[in-house]
Design a protein with these regions (language model features):
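Internal alpha-helical scaffold of NAD(P)-dependent oxidoreductase catalytic cores
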Residues: 22, 116-128, 139-231, 255-259
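Glycine-rich, N-terminal phosphate-binding loop of Rossmann-like dinucleotide-binding domains
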Residues: 76-79, 108, 154
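Rossmann-like NAD(P)(H) cofactor-binding subdomain of soluble oxidoreductases
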Residues: 81-139
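Conserved N-terminal Rossmann-fold NAD(P) cofactor-binding segment
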Residues: 29-72, 80-86
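NAD(P)+-binding Rossmann beta1-loop-alpha1 motif at the extreme N-terminus of oxidoreductases
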Residues: 1-44
Length: 269
């Protein structure tokens, strides 16, 4: 396939590199406003993958004007605060192509109905939502070794397109968790909320343990030994969850408030 990737998020870099590694011709536009020939992340594995794929000729990094807009797949992966940029880009594409073809994927976390707002800019129903679940400390593995991939689709035809695109990474039917786009958007925010509650609880336990002279590490091990809980995200502290974690929590809290539901737990987070 020929794939366009727009945006400079860690998800954009991971997808651009991995798609190229699996033989797709990938055209990556990190910044549609100015030309950027290189993109550097704090994750050296991602940087190395990108460099290798550029040298192999499967990954091309360039400006918007250099991208062929008749490619098979178009991925939009912008930061949560860059929605206006994404919408402006789609306006620009619409001016060039009135009836776009191919698959359009929103990987950006713009909150509920974010994908719908992008969809309104282009005259096509072939939109999917691929939640950004890339972990900063495990960028490549968090995608390639995921047990299941959440995909938001509103049409069966798009479901087939997404399976074809992701088959190198997810070969079995049970690995796909398809749901309506709006459900997938809310699920993405809910995941961030659940992680925040878990780490917040551990922070509280750490404070109590310190007061009582208890080793929090022993408590963590005990919690991890219970298979209902598991070992993930049991370390007290901050700095986890990905690039847009804080924004996700705020968006989730605002969404709950906007529909008139009071959640003391979300407010505490």
């Amino acid at each position: 396939m020929k794939i366009n990737v727009f945006g400079a998020t860690l998800q954009a870099g991971v997808l651009a590199g991995l798609f190229a590694e699996h033989g797709h011709q990938v055209f990556w536009c990190p910044n549609e406003l100015v030309r950027e020939d290189q993109v550097h992340y704090q994750n050296e594995d991602v940087n190395r993958l990108i460099e290798q794929q550029v040298l192999s000729g499967f990954l091309h990094i360039g400006s918007f004007d250099e991208l062929p807009l008749d490619n098979d797949v178009h991925v939009f992966s912008y930061a949560a605060t860059e929605q206006d940029r994404a919408l402006a880009l789609l306006d620009r594409i619409h001016q060039i192509i009135d009836k776009p073809k191919g698959l359009f994927i929103n990987g950006s976390t713009f909150g509920l109905h974010g994908t719908e707002q992008l969809k309104q800019k282009l005259n096509t129903e072939n939109w999917a939502y691929l939640p950004d679940v890339i972990q900063e400390g495990n960028a490549l593995g968090s995608f390639t070794y995921a047990k299941q991939v959440i995909v938001g689709v509103d049409h069966d035809a798009v479901k087939s397109m997404m399976q074809e695109l992701l088959r190198p990474f997810f070969q079995f039917q049970h690995q796909y968790l398809f749901m309506p786009i709006l459900d997938a958007e809310f699920t993405k925010l809910s995941i961030s909320g659940m992680l925040a509650m878990r780490i917040g609880y551990m922070n509280d336990l750490a404070l109590v343990s310190e007061k009582l002279g208890i080793d929090i590490f022993n408590v963590q091990q005990g919690l991890a030994a219970d298979n209902r809980i598991g070992s993930a995200y049991l370390s007290a502290g901050a700095g986890f969850g990905g690039e847009n974690f804080s924004h996700d929590i705020l968006t989730l809290s605002n969404t709950v408030s906007d529909i008139g539901v009071q959640s003391q737990l979300l407010e505490q987070i």
